[in-house]
Curated annotation (Swiss-Prot):
Keywords assigned by UniProt, alphabetized: Oxidoreductase
A GO cellular-component term linked to this record: cytoplasm
E.C. number: 1.8.4.11
Domain of life: Bacteria
GO biological process annotation, one example: protein modification process
Family: Belongs to the MsrA Met sulfoxide reductase family.
Molecular functions per Gene Ontology: L-methionine-(S)-S-oxide reductase activity; peptide-methionine (S)-S-oxide reductase activity
InterPro entries on file: Met_Sox_Rdtase_MsrA_dom (IPR002569), Met_Sox_Rdtase_MsrA_sf (IPR036509), MsrA_MetSO_reductase (IPR050162)
The protein's name: Peptide methionine sulfoxide reductase MsrA
Catalytic reactions on record: L-methionyl-[protein] + [thioredoxin]-disulfide + H2O = L-methionyl-(S)-S-oxide-[protein] + [thioredoxin]-dithiol; [thioredoxin]-disulfide + L-methionine + H2O = L-methionine (S)-S-oxide + [thioredoxin]-dithiol
Keyword Signal carried by entry: no
């Protein structure tokens, strides 16, 4: 039998992933910071999922961006439906810790969100982010439109040039379209750093400026 450590640096193969559950985890559907719903149809608004390490600090990066309507943390990109935090931390779900960002495209451009994403973490670290090691900390952009996907790929290529010039390696960010199912995390994790202002935040960027979204 494989131990949990076996899944820290590799994704579970078919048959290795935990089964999960049919029912979604309970969710208090109100954003603690802005009062908007966490779950809904969000008609007239755009959505994207970002993974950039521990989702506590990642979510705060985006709820502070003007034009973002709401944010929520959850699990995405893996195989286990409605996984729990402990299951995701085992590495046996294939999920990354993700932030759902719902935004008004008339108030904030996707390019600006991409710039926040790239500059808020080190996208060259593979299955970890800083001291947080495991597949659930991998960098990811899960797009909901073809236009987002094309823009994400172009931004990756532009940022790679800047990172290479600064001595960094290859970007390992997973970029996908269409976006996989987003499974909302437990209530305790939603807007965690608003509930615990001095709580853990392991995010750290490279210090390399991303050359997109400056004039958007």
């Amino acid at each position: 039998m494989l131990g949990i450590g076996a899944f820290k640096q590799r994704m579970p193969r078919p048959g290795e992933a935990l089964p999960g559950r049919e029912q979604a985890l309970p969710l208090h559907n109100t954003h603690l910071v802005n009062g908007h719903p966490l779950r809904g149809e969000f008609i007239g608004l755009a959505q994207v999922q970002f993974g950039l390490g521990c989702f506590w600090g990642a979510e705060r990066k985006f709820w502070n961006v003007p034009g973002v309507y709401t944010t929520a943390v959850g699990y995405a990109g893996g195989q286990t439906p409605n996984a729990t935090y402990s299951e995701v931390c085992s590495g046996q779900t294939g999920h990354t810790e993700a932030v759902l960002v719902v935004f008004d495209e008339q108030a904030v451009s996707f390019a600006q969100l991409l710039r926040t994403f790239w500059e808020s973490h080190d996208p060259t670290q593979g299955m970890q982010q800083g001291n947080d090691v495991g597949t659930q900390y991998r960098s990811a952009i899960y797009c909901t439109t073809q236009a987002q996907y094309d823009a994400a790929l172009a931004s990756r290529d532009a940022y790679q040039q800047q990172l290479t010039a600064a001595g960094y390696g290859a970007i390992t960010t997973e970029i996908r379209f269409p976006a996989p199912t987003f499974y909302y995390a437990e209530d305790d994790h939603q807007q965690y750093l608003a509930k615990h202002p001095n709580g853990y935040c392991g995010l750290g960027g490279t210090g390399v400026s991303c050359p997109i979204g400056l004039d958007a």
